Amino acid sequence: MKRSSTWMMVSALTLVMGCGGAPEDVPPDAPEAQEDVLFSQTILRERPDGTMSQETTFITREEQLAQIEARDALVRSLGARVTQQDLDDLLIDSGCAGSSLWLFDQTSRTGNQLCLYKQAGADAAWLNLGTVIRKFTNPYFVTWANAVRSLYSGVHPGALQSCTATSCSTLIYQSFNAYQLLNTISYGTQLNWAYLYTP
């Protein structure tokens, strides 16, 4: 019995000395690991049969700013001659097309991003933002309903509206023109439907 006790004591002491020592010093010139914050970018498309497809990718703020700058540059270069054909090919990192409506969940076009566009043949299109997942906050999935805080519209004008199952409010809405930039949405906490139309 003494023999096994001694052996256990030696083993424990060896483990403490081998594993319990002071941590190794990190060289002072070693760069600190700094992760870029990723934002989700959700692209929603209406298929010809009327069903919706949803694709979500993740981008950094730097990539998001590059997309915004690319769209700004194209709109500046085309002036009043902007057409949907010009903008459909504007894609950066398989992101949102330049002709899409870009919705953001933070002010000043930051945060998670949802991209919507209307089928070319349709005069108007509606979407319940409560049907689109924005993020997962344990233990819940959070949707885009009541979450839009800024937007950058695309080729189609439209509105964000506050709707129930039977009607939409005539007092609480945010309309926008084609290629309009809104860095703050005043009724953002109550807007749960998106609407695009062909003028």
Whereabouts are the PLM-identified features?
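Bacterial N-terminal signal peptides that target proteins for export
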Residues: 1-9
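Bacterial signal peptide processing site
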Residues: 20-23
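Compact beta-sheet-dominated domain cores in extracellular/mature segments
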Residues: 25-199
